[in-house]
Amino acid sequence: MTIRNWGPVRDCMRTDVTEVDGQLDVLSALKIMKKVGATSLVVKRRDDNDEYGMLLFSNVAKKVIAKNRAPERVNVYEIMAKPVLTVRPDMDIRYCARLFENFGISHAPVVENDKIVGIVSYYLLVLHGLPDLD
């Protein structure tokens, strides 16, 4: 059995997080995603008692394209995932991967001191979490 120190999520998370309002239409959100090169957007909380949401390409594919809805007529809040599971930046990468598997998710905001400091995904876990790839 090989024991390896995979390191913390902090080492592979993306720190340039783009947040949008849930009232934004999906077409505008997709334009933002394309412009910043993001595969997900964090949907802002409406107040301190609210939770974060996330918009993924899979939400758009399943809830807009597959249902033949016009993206300019659908609001982000209608199709986003909410509430979302969050992870800590000091969480071990292998536990983050297990969390994703156990809950069927592929992205999660990274939260420290009640603020989003990054985003982590399977893509980032694999390509930036494996030390032998550097």
Regions from the PLM with identified roles:
Residues M1-D134:
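Tandem CBS (Cystathionine beta-synthase) repeat/Bateman regulatory domains
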